């Protein structure tokens, strides 16, 4: 087997439990003003210098900079609670990191946005994705093509949503399917589960695997769910089948949230997050004729419960050299981003 490279970074944050929400047709738009930016880099940079929201984020960072418990090497939110990293990708010379950002003026998950040349030094950008018609913008992944970047994520209460952007700094996003894959409503009996998606492309067909859990294990215990869908146009999606075959590594009670699927070395990797034991991965073989993944090896990034302080919620992208770069979430109770490390210090004695 050829050498496999997995680069991992930690993402300092805190956790809020996933709630169950009633089905609603639509939710109000964000209280944060959504702006449109120019389509060329020179004008975008000039507009960002004067942007009031970017200035606000800079002021938040300035407030925290002298806090001894503020993470320096690891990315953390400019304000408020920080949830999962999402949609890590490389586009036109920059690394882009999206994350579940809960602004103080509208305490719902938006996709925050930061850009970097080296995956270490990050610069805040305006919010990328705003909730509505979905209640909140949960986890998902991106796919960078030659002419655009595709984001696919779980929109709370409606299903998986597809959005695209093609400008130099990925500032302007258009939702092309809301939802692309509708959520399974209460009382519906369907062979699949709709939650966090990962997206890729084979030939001219897009594929998405939605990870999560179903109560189909022994004694109605939760079991991981990996449902495969396909589309030719990003708008109309067809359910194919259960993506993972002959998987014997995960016990009842595990789930497969925040999935990512990609070739690595001469095999394939399936990254995911269990709400029981944190970030994990499966290596195996992918049958392109069947469009099924056959895992043969299981590994963990986290060796304890993911609460508190565990490594979880991976966001990944190809490094362009046959490897995969992964950024994980790391949380500690419901603390502001600048006080996360203080929690570990106080509980390390």
Annotate each PLM feature.
Residues 25-252, 263-309, 321, 327-349:
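Beta-rich carbohydrate-recognition and catalytic domains
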Residues 316:
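Phosphate/diphosphate-binding loops
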Residues 1-26:
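Bacterial Sec-dependent N-terminal signal peptides
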């Amino acid at each position: 087997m050829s050498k496999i490279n997995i680069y991992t970074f930690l993402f300092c944050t805190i956790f809020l439990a996933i709630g169950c929400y009633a089905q609603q047709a639509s939710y109000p738009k964000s209280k944060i003003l959504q702006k449109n930016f120019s389509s060329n880099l020179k004008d975008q940079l000039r507009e960002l210098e004067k942007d009031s929201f970017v200035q606000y984020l800079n002021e938040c960072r300035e407030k925290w900079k002298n806090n001894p418990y503020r993470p320096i090497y690891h990315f953390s939110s400019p304000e408020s609670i920080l949830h999962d990293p999402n949609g890590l990708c490389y586009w036109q010379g920059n690394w882009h990191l999206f994350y579940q950002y809960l602004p103080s003026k509208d305490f719902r998950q938006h996709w925050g946005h930061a850009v970097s040349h080296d995956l270490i030094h990050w610069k805040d950008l305006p919010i990328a994705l705003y909730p509505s018609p979905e209640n909140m913008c949960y986890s998902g992944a991106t796919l960078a093509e030659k002419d655009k970047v595709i984001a696919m994520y779980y929109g709370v209460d409606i299903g998986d949503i597809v959005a695209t952007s093609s400008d130099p700094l990925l500032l302007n996003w258009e939702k092309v399917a809301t939802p692309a894959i509708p959520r399974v409503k209460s009382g519906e009996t369907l062979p699949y589960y709709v939650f966090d998606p990962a997206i890729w492309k084979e030939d001219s067909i897009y594929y998405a695997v939605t990870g999560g859990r179903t109560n189909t294990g022994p004694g109605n215990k939760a079991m991981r769910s990996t449902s495969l869908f396909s589309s030719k146009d990003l708008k109309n999606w067809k359910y194919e089948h259960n993506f993972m075959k002959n998987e014997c590594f995960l016990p009842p009670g595990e789930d497969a949230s925040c999935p990512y699927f990609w070739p690595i070395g001469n095999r394939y990797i399936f990254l995911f997050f269990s709400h029981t034991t944190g970030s994990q991965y499966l290596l195996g073989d992918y049958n392109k004729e069947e469009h099924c993944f056959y895992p043969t090896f299981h590994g963990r990034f986290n060796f304890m419960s993911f609460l508190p302080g565990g490594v979880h919620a991976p966001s990944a992208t190809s490094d362009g050299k046959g490897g995969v770069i992964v950024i994980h979430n790391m949380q500690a109770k419901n603390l502001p981003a600048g006080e996360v490390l203080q929690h570990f210090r106080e509980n390390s004695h």
